[in-house]
């Protein structure tokens, strides 16, 4: 087991070449988690350390936005974007029990870490995701036209509270990185128009980046979906790295050239993960290892890359496929 060294991930996020390959996932569950536990890991920190990560991904507190989603579906694994809205008009907005991030429990950030390891504090979903959870996707799209002031007020309440959540998390010495996780796109378009994204969503992400940088810590974006029409916005928000890539949108190899570019270190945004989930789950271990090694080789002189899945390793991914991916870091 290699020793954790968070400075290697910092080099990646600074778009430099790390001293050795770096691994990255939004979080670990399913086969990756189970494999580590079966081999002696006793807690979440052990899982990340045993598998070769330099950080532990955690939700920093019990803060969130209560909704009806999941309350009547038992163990359902999927849900509609229009499922169980709780804010439908001004009256339900005024009655909603908005939680105070400062009144929540941040004790997950007090956990003991091995030398060289830090926490990555991710959110309880993001600005757009929580607005959709509270209102419903179709309802939100209609609200932007029928009652734009109410829509603006909802985004204000969600965004300002998430910013405070990250501000509190960033104060902890154990936190080395803030992760703003917020899905923005379908396969061929953004979930809202780019103009509406710029008006309601992006300013809060820019504020989260500012909070991270003011605390001397990098900020990373996890956002699934199409992003070609908002590429300049991504750069303007100032994120140090981006996570989540799909082959049917833009393969990680092409994304790396787009975000890092050139032939030297110092591109615009580090690329994290990117092994497409369909590829990861359905290819042979040999094919996965070959593509993983090729991606590391592509970044070997320019840096700014950490190896991992395109999103997160799902329950149905064969464990040997996951191991074939991460084993690439140990090969010349």
Give residue ranges: language-model regions.
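Active-site loop segments of alpha/beta catalytic cores
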Residues: 1-43, 76-79, 92-332
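Catalytic domains of carbohydrate-active enzymes, especially glycoside hydrolases
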Residues: 41-62, 168-173
């Amino acid at each position: 087991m290699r020793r954790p060294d968070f400075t290697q991930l910092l080099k990646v996020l600074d778009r430099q070449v790390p001293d050795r390959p770096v691994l990255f996932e939004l979080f670990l569950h399913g086969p990756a988690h189970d494999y580590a536990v079966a081999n002696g890991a006793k807690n979440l920190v052990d899982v990340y350390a045993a598998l070769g990560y330099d950080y532990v991904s955690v939700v920093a507190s019990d803060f969130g936005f209560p909704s009806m989603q999941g309350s009547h579906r038992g163990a359902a694994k999927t849900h509609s974007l229009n499922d169980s809205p709780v804010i439908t008009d001004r009256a339900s907005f005024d009655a909603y029990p908005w939680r105070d991030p400062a009144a929540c429990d941040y004790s997950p950030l007090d956990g003991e870490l091995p030398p060289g390891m830090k926490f990555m504090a991710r959110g309880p979903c993001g600005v757009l995701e929580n607005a959709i959870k509270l209102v419903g996707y179709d309802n939100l799209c209609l609200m932007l036209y029928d009652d734009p002031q109410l829509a603006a007020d909802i985004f204000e309440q969600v965004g300002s509270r998430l910013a405070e959540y990250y501000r509190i998390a960033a104060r902890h010495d154990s936190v080395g990185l803030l992760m703003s996780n917020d899905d923005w796109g379908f396969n061929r378009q953004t979930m809202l128009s780019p103009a509406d994204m710029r008006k309601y969503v992006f300013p809060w992400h820019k504020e989260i980046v500012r909070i991270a940088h003011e605390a001397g810590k990098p900020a990373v974006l996890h956002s699934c979906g199409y992003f070609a029409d908002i590429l300049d916005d991504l750069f303007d928000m100032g994120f140090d790295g981006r996570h989540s890539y799909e082959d049917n949108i833009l393969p990680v190899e092409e994304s790396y050239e787009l975000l890092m570019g050139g032939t030297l270190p110092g591109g615009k945004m580090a690329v994290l993960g990117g092994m497409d989930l369909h590829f990861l789950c359905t290819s042979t271990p040999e094919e996965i290892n070959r593509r993983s090694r090729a991606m590391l080789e592509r970044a070997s002189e320019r840096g700014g890359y950490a190896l991992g899945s395109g999103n997160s390793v799902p329950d149905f991914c064969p464990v040997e496929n996951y191991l074939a991916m991460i084993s690439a870091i140990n090969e010349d």
